[in-house]
Amino acid sequence: WNSEITHKLAQGAIDTLVKHGVKEENIDVMHVPGTVELTYGAALYVSGKKKFGMLKYADAVIVIGCVIQGDTPHFDYVCQSVTQGVTILNAQGGANDRAYYTPRYCPVIFSVLTTLDKQQALDRAGGRLGNKGVEGAVTAIKMANLL
């Protein structure tokens, strides 16, 4: 959803990570069909994502999305769901073994815009208020270095 905005946020995050020394081959981007599904995608990286037959663990996960308020309460439900999901991942970690729950912790950075209209989102995706994807990347670097 709102791909014009989320692509700008993601590119800002990627450019910032590379600028600060992260190798592009170490940046993995996953697309999910909607904002509510962001938490599931993040959980895969927290708990270890299989790639080329090997488990791959993230040093940090940046959850990027954009929810623009409409005429129904759906906005509130979506925003609450993704916020709560990210909070739970940060507080409780993810299971790195599905049979035996062993939590693994990894910072999950909330870079989801929740705006009243499209202009507010554009302003925060490289517009007059900067790029929240850039801020998410800086936060991810700082949090990964805490470990």
Where are these regions (language model features)?
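Short beta-strand segments at enzyme active-site cores
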Residues: 29, 58-64, 105-113
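Short, ordered loop/turn segments at secondary-structure junctions
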Residues: 1, 32, 66-67, 113-117
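C-terminal binding/interaction regions
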Residues: 75-76, 80-147
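Glycine-rich phosphate-binding loop
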Residues: 41-86
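Active-site rim loops that border cofactor/substrate pockets in soluble metabolic enzymes
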Residues: 20-56
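Glycine-rich phosphate/diphosphate-binding loop of Rossmann-like nucleotide-binding domains
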Residues: 1-33
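Short, well-ordered amphipathic alpha-helical segments that serve as non-catalytic structural scaffolds
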Residues: 7-16, 38-44, 85-86, 136
